[in-house]
Each structure stands twice: as C-alpha cells, then as structure tokens.
A protein has these predicted regions:
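Conserved active-site motif detector
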Residues: 1-121
Length: 121
C-alpha cells in the first residue's frame, strides 16, 4: 500500500504547564504520541521533546489523532511561531501526518469536519 503525507495547522496546548522545561523554537520538530496513562482524558495525545511531555494536541482533535496513530500512522509536530494566549498558552505548529493513502484521506476529512464543527458551535 502506498504511503502519503499531509499537514494540519494547529497549536500545542498547555505550554503554561510546561514552560519551565520547554522554550519553543520556530522550526523545532517534536514527537507526538498517545498518552495512555492520562487520568483526565482517555483520548490525550502528547507532544514530546526528547521523550518528555511539553504539551498536548488540542482536545477537539485528539480523538482523531489517536485513531490515526492507533491505525499505524505517524505524526510529528513542527513549531511555526511564538507562544500566544488562547486556551492557556499555546504554541502555533503544523502537525505532519504520514501513513497509508486511504487513512490519510480519511483523517484529513475528519479533521476538517471536526474543526468546522468547532467554529459553528
């Protein structure tokens, strides 16, 4: 099966919690993985630097990210801007998805629907 890639502009959430251990730099690449032991959110997906959590994927799209990773996809995060106020302190980024063609298409459609629904609710 062919592999594809896609990008999704978003943010790393929770920087206000991790600012003492992480100073984001534009262009920095971070790992993204399911956070299996998060007692507050069973769909939590963490953003990590050197295996240390420095933030999270926004809750609105975390379920979609988790499904993608569970089905063999890979996600990386690239910092694109300086931190800003949003839902706490957020760091602008692009999430890079890599996986099977069919799954990439489905995930991008889900992300588009999820973020469109958020804008109108």
């Amino acid at each position: 099966m062919d592999m594809s890639s896609a990008n999704f502009e978003s943010v790393v959430r929770g920087h206000h919690i991790y600012k003492s251990i992480w100073n984001p730099a534009v262009g920095e690449r971070l790992d993204v993985s399911i956070e299996r032991d998060n007692a507050h959110d069973r769909y939590a997906v963490s953003v990590q630097r050197d295996s240390v959590i420095v933030g999270h994927v926004p809750r609105e799209v975390a379920k979609v990210f988790k499904a993608f990773i569970t089905h063999g996809g890979e996600v990386a995060c690239e910092v694109t801007g300086r931190r800003k106020r949003g839902n706490g302190l957020e760091v602008p980024c692009v999430y890079h998805f890599k996986g099977k063609d069919k799954i990439i298409v489905g995930i991008m459609q889900l992300l588009k629907l999820t973020t469109a629904n958020k804008m109108y609710s």
